C-alpha cells in the first residue's frame, strides 16, 4: 500500500484577506481526497501567530476562535508549534494577500526545498503587483486600462501633480478607480469622480500599500476565467459578474451574504468574446510566468466590446462562492479532482526544478 502524501495546508496570515483564507482552507480541508492525502493544517493568526495542530484544525470549524498560547512567527525560536507535524511532502498555501501570495511564502518553500501549490517566487511577486502585471500584459498584446502609479514619496510631496485630480483627469478621464497596487479582493479600492473623493481615496489606498494605481474606469461587465497547469495549461470557460446598477465588485459584494452581485457561469456571451477572454488569459498567464493556477479578471468594455485586463489573481479563493473552482467544475473538473491536480502540478514542477543545475561542475 502506497503511503499517503502529507500536505501542509497553510492559511490565515497577517492580511486584509484573512477571513477569505480561512473559508478557502476549510473547503480544501473538507474536499481533499483523503484516500491520497493526509492534511496537516497550519494556521497563522491575523496577528501573525503560529497555532499548533489541534488549534489549526479547530479554527477550520470555528473561524472566530482565538489561538491559545500563541507563538510569534517572527521569532524563529518560537516555531516550536511545528514540532507536532510530521515531515511535509508538499505545501498548499492558501494565505491570500501580502506575505502569502507575493513571493515571500513561496521563497520560504524554495529554501526548505519542498514542492508547493501555485506560482513560483517571481510570478507570485509580479502578479501581486498590479502595475507590473499591466506592463507585462501590454507587452503580450493584451489591452489594459490606462493608469498612473503614485508612489509613497510622490504622495508625501504636496506639489506632485499626481495628487491633483484635475491633472490626473486630463490624462485618464474624470471617472477613476483608485486602488493599492499590491492588494486583492477589492481591498482599499475606491471609485471617484471629483477632487474631494480623489483625496479620500488616495488616503485610503495608501493605508494598504506604498504604491497606488489610479486607473480610468472601464465601463462594462466583469468577466473572469481560470487557468490550470504548468507548461501546457488549460483554460476553463468564462464567468460573468452581474453587478447592481452603479456598483462594482467590492470586498463586501464578493463575500457578504447580502451581496448585490451575482455570478453567471457560464457567461451568456457570444462565442467570439468568450474565446477572446480565454486567449487573453493564456497570454497573460504565460507572460507573467504563472504556474499551477491563476484566475484572470477582465472587463468587457461596453462601447467597443474590447476585453480589458483587470488583474491576475495567482492564488484565487476557494470559498463556496469563488469563481475559480466553479469555472472548472462547469467544464467537468470537480472540486476534489481540482485539488488533486493542483498538488500533482506542484510535484511536477518541483521534480523538473531538481533537474536544473545550480553550480558549474
From Swiss-Prot:
Cite the binding residues for ATP.
169-224
**Single GO BP term:** cell wall organization
What are the alphabetically sorted keywords of the record? ATP-binding, Cell shape, Cell wall biogenesis/degradation, Cytoplasm, Ligase, Magnesium, Manganese, Metal-binding, Nucleotide-binding, Peptidoglycan synthesis
Question: ATP-grasp domain spans which residues?
Answer: 134-344
- Please provide, alphabetically and separated by semicolons, the GO molecular function terms listed in this UniProt record: ATP binding; D-alanine-D-alanine ligase activity; metal ion binding
Gene3D superfamilies, A to Z: 3.40.50.20, ATP-grasp fold, A domain, ATP-grasp fold, B domain
Q: Name one GO cellular component term.
A: cytosol
Q: What is its EC number?
A: 6.3.2.4
The metabolic or biological pathway listed in the UniProt record of this protein is: Cell wall biogenesis; peptidoglycan biosynthesis
Q: Where does Mg(2+) 2 bind?
A: 311, 313
Q: Where in the cell is it found?
A: Cytoplasm
List positions binding Mg(2+) 1.
Answer: 297, 311
By its UniProt entry, which Pfam families does this protein fall under? Dala_Dala_lig_C, Dala_Dala_lig_N
Primary localization class, coarse? cytoplasm
Give me the reactions it catalyses.
2 D-alanine + ATP = D-alanyl-D-alanine + ADP + phosphate + H(+)
Cofactors required: Mg(2+); Mn(2+)
Has UniProt tagged this entry with the keyword Magnesium?
A: yes
Question: Cofactor stoichiometry and binding?
Answer: Binds 2 magnesium or manganese ions per subunit.
Instruction: Identify its protein family.
Output: Belongs to the D-alanine--D-alanine ligase family.
Q: Which NCBIfam families match?
A: D_ala_D_alaTIGR, PRK01966.1-4
Functional note: Cell wall formation.
By what name is this protein known?
D-alanine--D-alanine ligase
Q: What is the lineage of its organism?
A: Bacteria, Bacillati, Bacillota, Bacilli, Lactobacillales
